[in-house]
Each structure stands twice: as structure tokens, then as C-alpha cells.
């Protein structure tokens, strides 16, 4: 009976005692650590700090429970009957109950923090349930299954050694070792994904204050596939019949293959196997060996050509897929240069009649060749996963200065610390960041956005319609601008302040447009209009979450800002943008002399 297993577990001073002491220590850590209530991500950061130790404790307890049962049922193990497996199944249910209690306790801690921070809302509660389920409940379940499998090793010494090895393998230290070796070994990229998926112990794991911790459905699938893989291994090890051994062995191979299936979901601070997304921009600019093929000719400037209009179809699931129809003002050019993030792979380029056009793609640059003499439009189909910013089923942050759609001309879209700002003599980049310039000229945009996530989406463009179609939320956007910013999450709020459309997150207590914060916005808009030639009337002001690589940008109809760089915004507006239109700086591919080319 399961009741007997529960009583035996509670009477065990080692198992129940260690678990009780551990959770008392966890409580002390959580409730004595200073928490800044305006930081919604702080409770999640604390949870991720203790997660490796939660994993280790449950791993050891599971090993002890199943090892004791194996000793008491050694005769059944030798005979190969089902008594041992049934006894282990009861113990598994007891441990699953302990897993559930720990998950509920941490969930209650998060709810208390949200109430104190005055950000309690249904969307945040549902998100927290998902995070606790993935990073606590499922990870403890993984630890239980691994402990069960290790207990099948006959020697206790070998078992303890395997526990120590397992903890090291699933810890960040092993992940760091693999990451340092993965540049030259493709197989290690896959191992990096395997072991980095489960938990990370460093602070600052949250992407930003709106996206928080990545918790897409793919994480649930992969964790469950790994659990099923471990259970199949256990069944294979203890199956008394050859038929059962064969079936369980095939199931184990199948679940492991499913676990390794590639995915487009965002793994913040993790490597993605077999994609160039595994290397950050900083690493690429400093270390990557660039292609020997140069797509530019000496003397050609970065501007390229003018675009009459964009007609885009964008689909956002765990991966970003898009089709951009670009109408150039001059359809007789032999070549059309575009800037497009290196993480997006161009699948096809055609003209208005559907006939293929040849193209070259190298790093952030795309060159389309026109062999037909005259074309009306260029249709570019591409896909990929966003780096630095994001667009998944959980949230979206794609500012206008981020080349997630093909922009005319070649531009340097990422700046490193110490680089000179083009157009601003003597001014250097402080931190690595994406360029703040919107590279397109004002043109007509028509966007159809199909989003798998059910969160609201906002943009500087006008929303014409919002419908539901085959499990997707479809947004119809249209307008005239020099760039598109798309932002989406479950916490968006919008308010009109003196003719300015302000978009912000309700989780951002310091900037949410209500109460005393309204006067802060009015003062900022007044300063911008008094000290620059930029009129805020009728514009859109998007408050972006603050995180690595985020900065701000200024377009003709909207501003994206964290409200941390007021002085920089005014300076930029007064200098006519960071990259003045008359700047014909040449960008050459296949080289790494970025700083020299910009001086």
C-alpha cells in the first residue's frame, strides 16, 4: 500500500529529516535575502540560485529510497518477477508527492512577493504556475528518475560516484566547460543543449522584466521526453522477459531522439545546436572567422536604394518565419543590398512573377541580383530565432533598429564597447549594444502578424484588425513610418498622455503610466520638445524592458526607450541621429576591421 510507503518514508530520519532540514534552510535563505519589490524577476532569480541544490537533495533521497527497496527485494530482483517494480512504483508516488509539496511551497513564496510588489495579476500568476511546473516540478521529477536509475547499480560506492558525476554534469561548471570546447566540435553543441536545458545557477537569468524566465511549451515536452527515457531505461534494466527488454529498449531510443530534436525556442544564456545562434554578437565580432567572399565593391556606399513599400507576412511560434515583399523605387538596378540579422536564414528570393532571383547572404548582409532587367517587387522568405531580442509564444520585443526585416543598404547593426559612434566625433560606445539608428527611410508598411502566443501585441503602426485563425491570433497592421517596432506580452498597458501614445508594462512599477508617473512622462516630453526639433504630438512612446543589448531608438513616428537615457535621447535628436544621412561609410564583408572602417 502507498500509505505504508508514506509512513516508512516519514519515519526514516535520513530521508524525511534531510528533506525537512533542507526546506527549512531554503526558507531561511528566501526570507532573509533582501528583495527589491520593484524587481518582479527577483523571486525567480532566488529560486534559480537554489535550484541546483534542490536537484541534488532530491537526487540523493531518491537514490536512498530505491536502493533500500532493492536490498529488501533482492530475491525478487534475481527471480525477475514484478514485486520489486511494484514496490519501487509506490516509492515513486511518495517522492512525487514530496515534489508537489515543494513546488506548491515555492509557488506560495512567489505569490507573496507579487502581492508585496503590488503587481499581482492573473497573467503573472498563470505564468508563475508554468515556471514552477517546468523548473521545479519537472526538474525534481528528472532527479527522482535519475536517482532511481542509479540505484540499480549494485555497489553503493559506484552509486554515490554516479550521483556526484550527475550533479557536476547538470551544473553550470560542466556547461561552461562544454561551451568553451563547442566552437570546434559540433557534437559538443548537442551535449551543451542536453545539459544546459535543466537548470542554471547564476543570477540574472531572466531575459527582462516582461519576458522573465523562458517557459515555452517546448521545455515541457523536452523534460517529459527525458523522464520517459529514464523510465524506459529502468524498465529495460529490470524487465524479466526478452520481449519486455526489447520494447523498453526501443522506447528509450525513441524518447532520447525526441529529446534531441532541434527547436527554435529561445534559450537565454544557452547554446542552440547546429545553428549560428549559438554564438553571440560580441563573440562573432571578436572571434569568428568571416567569409572570404566580399559582397561589396570599393566605393559603394551603404545606402543602396529607396523602398516604396513593404508588405510583410510574419508568423511567430517557437521560431520566427517571415515573407517580406519589398517594392524598390528603381526596379532596374542590377543589385539590391539589404541588411538582415545573421541569425535569419534566407530560404528563397523571387520577383513579382514568382521567378527566382539569385542572392548571396554573408553575416548580416544580403545581396539580391537582378538578372531580369526590370522588376516590380522583391519577395524574400526567411526564418530563424531572434538573438538579443525575442519573438516567441511567450513574448515579443522587436524594436525598429533591429534588422528583423530586410532593410535597404548595408549597415553595421551592432556596436561593441569602445567603438566610435559614427557621426558623433569623440564619442565612444559604453556597453555592447545594437545600433540606435532606424536605417529605413519613411515608407508604407503593411504587416500581417500571426502569433501562436495569446498575448496582446502593440506597434507604432495602426492596428486595423485582430482575429483568431487556426490557433493563431492574427494582427493586421498598417501605416507609414521609417521602421516597425513590435512589442507583445501579457502585461501591456496603453495610455494617452497629452497626445502621446504611451505603451508600457504593468510590471514596470517605476514607469507604468499612472499616478505620479504621469507627470514624469509629461516632463520628459516637454524637455524633448524644448531642447530638440522633435515634436512628440501624435507620436508613440514605447517603454522597453531593460536588459542586455537593449537600448533605445528614435524613429520619425515613435521612440523606444527604457527611460534610463533621457540625456542620450536629446543628444541624439540634436545631432540628427547617430548615423547622419550624408555619412557614406563603406562596410566591407569578409573583414573584421569594423572600427577602422568607421573612423
Show where each model-derived region lies.
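A surface-exposed beta-strand-loop module
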Residues: 335, 343-400, 467-470, 513
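Secretory targeting signals
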Residues: 30-52, 63-64, 92-159
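Hydrophobic alpha-helical transmembrane segments
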Residues: 1-69, 236-246, 250-256
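Juxtacatalytic substrate-recognition/specificity segment
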Residues: 41, 322, 366, 447, ...
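Hydrophobic alpha-helical segments
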Residues: 111, 119-235
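Helix-loop-helix units of permease transmembrane domains in multi-pass membrane transporters
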Residues: 61-101
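N-terminal, polar/Ser/Thr-rich
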Residues: 121-123, 174-224, 241-318
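Extended, low-hydrophobicity, Ser/Thr/Pro/Gly-biased non-transmembrane segments
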Residues: 382-481
